Amino acid sequence: MATVKLRKALRMKGEKMKTDSRSLVLQGYVWLMMPALLFLLFWFRWEVALPVAALMVWSFVRLCRPSARESLQTEGYSPVSASRKRLLLMAAAVVAYVMVCGIGGFVTQLPNDHAWRNGVFFDLSRRDWPVAYEGDGAPMLCYYFAFWLPSAVVAKATGLIAAGDAAQVLYAAWGTWIALCFISSMSGGRMLWRVFLVFIGFNAMDVVTAFFFSDESFSVFEDPWAAQLMWLSTTSGRFAASANPVIYNFIYNQGIAVWVFMSLLMHGRRDTGRLMLLFGMLPAFAPIPALAVAPWVAWRLLRGFRQALTVENVAGLLFALLTSFFLLQNNSGSALRRAYPDTPVGEALLLAAAYYALSFGAFVIFIWRYVRRDGLYWSLVAMCVAVSLVGVGKTPDLAWRISLPAVVMTAALVCRRAAETAAMSRGVRCAFVAVLLVGSFSSVWSVVFTLHEESCVWRGERERKYLSMLGRIADPSQPYYNNFVATGDSFYRRHLAPPDIRSRE
């Protein structure tokens, strides 16, 4: 009897665990919908929030029904299969990567965006929702903060910011895991370490674009710990195509959501019956990247208009409209302008086309088989070029953020190609590896920089976590005040905000 049990245990240990694409789709929708529902229920009047929330929940219930199973299985996607040991090791590696990028503040945070991210999370955790402040113009927190809402609930429930920080790590790791599993699913279902390494190291050739487009000068030999060496993707003024570590270090509140969204979109792009539900949740996390996808989504919905008339799409449209009314009151977000007005439009577009050709061109050679007739991919690249003419507030943030969907889709397809290296000829494989290594310079450097900064923490030379903005988000003297607050009257305050917000202003 004992021998039989031992054999059974050994068989179970060697068994592979499988996850089909339906499970991944449901996980992706839960990941996006949890913060969306929290935002809806606490930032809007009950008579507005409850009907839309009910529609969104009903849409998810319809998604879970057995009758929807076939529509969630997409050709070209295989069940993800790996041993329990490999899955656990890769899950641990994902958590470690998220922590090394500074999310949660358990490993050294790099300068200096984390200071404001920590400040937003602190106010969401410590103040009543919607977050309002005292001061002229009745300021209130107005930012795309959906990423932090589940973690803020944990912090509120426990009374511990540290518990919320741990929840941030787990939520970020879960979103990353969903994206990696989708990549594995479209790569034959194999969970490969080389795919994971390409994922964390992907960089859109910023070492090349910085050489041609940046006015700054930096050298690894002159100042090896200059922060610009990992920020190369943001040193070219109006243009940017971020590295994945830059996304995870500085704009993770948007970037991880874009990874989950793009994974779902690439998988279910032909399903117009749920397209607006999926797209409608993105602006609460990442409104600027959502603009990059909007033209393609609009085209697909118009093309399949009859199939698009669904409860799911109505729910997504209503949620997107409510999110837009909230975000449009932001002091910076409502101020669009022409970026670099002294440059003629034609010249600016040529420069943008050259920049993004350098950013993505070397990778497109290897993923050409996937993208040559892919309207989604080329529309995302075209939006990168076109929106380089536009700025928001005082910074070129619109152009910097709008490239995220193109970067993410390129990275996902490059990861898929990395899973096929065994089928490449030796010459193609060597060229592919060379392109990845050249592109990964600042990605590798950001990890090296983090380890250096962590050693500084141990020596007592700096703090691990940026705390300078805790409780100061609504301080008008801080330089990015307008990015995070809304003041004065607005359509949202008059008609959509909960009535009790006036008593807290």
Give the role of each language-model region:
Residues A2-R84:
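Membrane-embedded, hydrophobic transmembrane alpha-helices
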Residues E47-S59, L170-W174, F239-I247, I251-F261, ...:
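Membrane-embedded alpha-helical segments of multi-pass membrane proteins
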Residues M34-L40, P245-V246, L264-L265, T272-P295:
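Membrane-interface alpha helices of multi-pass inner-membrane proteins
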Residues K18-V30, S78-L89, L192, D271-L275, ...:
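Membrane-interfacial loop-to-transmembrane alpha-helix junctions, especially the N-terminal start
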Residues L38-F44, W58-R62, R84-N112, A172-L180, ...:
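Transmembrane signal-anchor helices characteristic of membrane glycosylation enzymes that use polyprenol
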Residues C101-V260:
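Active-site lumenal/periplasmic loops and adjacent helix-entry segments of GT-C-fold
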Residues M56-C64, G175-M186, A257-R269, A294-L302, ...:
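Transmembrane alpha-helical segments
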Residues L38, L317-E505:
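Transmembrane helical bundles and short interhelical boundary loops of multi-pass, membrane-embedded
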